[in-house]
Curated annotation (Swiss-Prot):
One matching Pfam family: DUF4939
Domain of life the protein comes from: Eukaryota
Family membership noted in the UniProt record: Belongs to the LDOC1 family.
Biased composition (Polar residues): 82-94
The protein, known as: Retrotransposon Gag-like protein 6
Keyword Coiled coil: yes
Originating organism: Homo sapiens
Ranges where the record places region Disordered: 82-106, 214-239
Amino acid sequence: MVQPQTSKAESPALAASPNAQMDDVIDTLTSLRLTNSALRREASTLRAEKANLTNMLESVMAELTLLRTRARIPGALQITPPISSITSNGTRPMTTPPTSLPEPFSGDPGRLAGFLMQMDRFMIFQASRFPGEAERVAFLVSRLTGEAEKWAIPHMQPDSPLRNNYQGFLAELRRTYKSPLRHARRAQIRKTSASNRAVRERQMLCRQLASAGTGPCPVHPASNGTSPAPALPARARNL
């Protein structure tokens, strides 16, 4: 009786089975690596979007803080008394004098001095509207526009020390938007004052020399603009 020869036919299939499993494992690992790489890229994109959203939220919160600050003085635009406050004889009661609002300041250094002068005048005549430092800062910020308004937003954050410090806010505003021409004029004034002071001191020295009879007064270069002043005698230097 002839036995069926199945062992030789099954051996190639058994040998191919481990190779197929190995290929499946390799394919699975490759797929996992690709998936992991894609997830990492997606996570990086999400982190970038989160950072952008955080920045946008901070900007919105800063603008909201600015709007809330402006809303703290609801009567700032009402300068003259309302009609209901007119008395029966048609006259208005004694109140603070009507004062026009300061012109908005957008960051032009040449207009800063005039803007601050208008602010001082308004706050003097409308002092009852500004009981504290925060109200003063809030009103000043409400008159800023453009670049100056953007500059003020960080200083209106809850943790900013300038939010409740009017003089400090003014100092920082002046430091940021000071006029170069105004600074040059002040430097020239200081230089001229120093020169005038030197002339007065030399004139006093001349009078002392004349009273002591030690000789003529030395010429100061500023008096004729032609030659430098000669050296003073030893006795004059000791006076």
